[in-house]
Design a protein with these regions (language model features):
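Active-site rim elements
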Residues: 34-37, 153-157, 173, 203, ...
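Extracellular ligand-binding/catalytic regions of CAZymes and related secreted enzymes
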Residues: 21-27, 53-57, 202-212, 218-255
Length: 255
């Protein structure tokens, strides 16, 4: 009896070791956040906790309301070293230092995956005046040119049937509605970008036509997942939004 008990204990111990060895190792994620017009203090916690409940991630946060502080940190050599992905939830629309912006883009062109939401689409390009929108490095990284938005009303998000089984969105419902919203104008979808879902404000609100609101892009060696959804805390806190950005992280990092 003792031999049987010892054998069962040993078998259980070995199984535990094997299970631990095959457990999903945490990704290392850098959340770059801060700036104007949004409750970034609240959203950073919701985003990190929401993703980590669905996918193991060890987070580092770079939270700066002052664009000069954020720029200083993102200008340091090797700022992205050791991270499996960088998540941008920030709003620094007035940045006009092209060399600085190009240096951030180079990090992802060289292979670091990028996740971007909402006002990241309005950051780092509007005040660059000597290039066409489609030529600006940040827009090329994001995969779209966006400027402006509609009113604060809920909107419907509908998957594109052609890409309904894309890994970054396949587990999402075919259609869902945001509790609150601020639908961004996507003035141009750049070559190579795959739009996975469109947002629709309805006929009474601008923009009158559905706008791309979830998409993926490949920029150099780096995968990019982006969504323009996410202005209000109520929307960022929904299961649908947290499921969506987690799927984006999984796709971009190969998890």
């Amino acid at each position: 009896m003792k031999k049987i008990s010892a054998l069962l204990f040993l078998s259980g111990f070995i199984f535990s070791l094997v299970a631990d060895d095959h457990a999903e190792k945490p990704l290392k994620g850098l959340l770059v956040t801060g700036g104007g017009h949004h409750d970034y203090g609240f959203q950073q916690n919701v985003i990190m906790e929401g993703i980590s409940q669905r996918l193991p991630v060890k987070w580092t946060v770079m939270f700066d309301m002052d664009p000069r502080e954020s720029k200083s940190k993102l200008s340091k050599e090797g700022w992205s070293d050791g991270y499996d992905f960088v998540f941008y939830n920030h709003c620094f629309a007035r940045e006009d230092d092209k060399a600085f912006i190009d240096s951030i883009v180079k990090v992802h062109e060289d292979g670091v995956p990028a996740i971007a939401m909402h006002c990241a689409m309005h950051s780092y390009h509007i005040f660059i005046k000597d290039q066409k929108p489609e030529e600006k490095s940040w827009n090329k990284l994001m995969g779209v040119h966006s400027h402006g938005h509609g009113p604060h009303v809920p909107f419907d998000v509908t998957k594109v049937s052609e890409y309904a089984d894309h890994p970054a969105i396949k587990d999402m419902p075919d259609k869902w509605r945001t509790p609150k919203g601020e639908l961004y104008f996507i003035l141009k979808v750049l070559d190579g970008t795959k739009v996975l879902a469109y947002g629709d404000n309805g006929p009474k609100h601008k923009p009158e036509k559905p706008q791309a609101c979830v998409w993926v892009n490949q920029y150099g060696k780096g995968k990019v997942f982006a969504t323009s959804i996410g202005h209000h805390n109520e929307t960022v806190s929904t299961k649908e939004f947290l499921d969506l950005i987690t799927s984006g992280v999984r796709w971009a990092t190969g998890r």
